[in-house]
Amino acid sequence: YDSSDSLALLDGIVDIYMPDMKYSNEVIARKYSKIPDYPRINRMALHEMSRQVGDLQLDEIGIAFRGLLVRHLVLPNDLAGSKEILRFLAEEISPNTYLNLMDQYRPCYQAGQFPELNRRVTHEEFLEVYQLAKQFGLYRLDR
């Protein structure tokens, strides 16, 4: 993940940022990805990216030319903490944030060691996150 210090060096250079928001909970991030302090650093990075490029802008034929496009992979059993991620985007970044909600999680590698992570996301779980995004006022949703 990117630190806000390294991102500051890119100010004025990058036109489009496409970060992932993987987890909203530090304990979960550490457990499954061994990423210490992920939520805090990820949020700081998104604030910096948003400051630099703002909401995603499209030209007259629908091609993005500047802005922020956030990706979020929905995990089974809400292990990503999707509600908090959606709240953060809507309230602290912008309700105009372009959000790609992804349901293509497939358990592989060491996922079998974690029964709660060792299955695909159900259609119902994905729809719940999609509806939550709309409830938070996020409307630029892509799947």
Where do the PLM segments sit?
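Short amphipathic alpha-helical segment that frequently serves as the phosphate-/nucleotide-binding helix
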Residues: 83-86, 123, 127
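Gly/Pro-rich active-site loop or hairpin
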Residues: 112-124
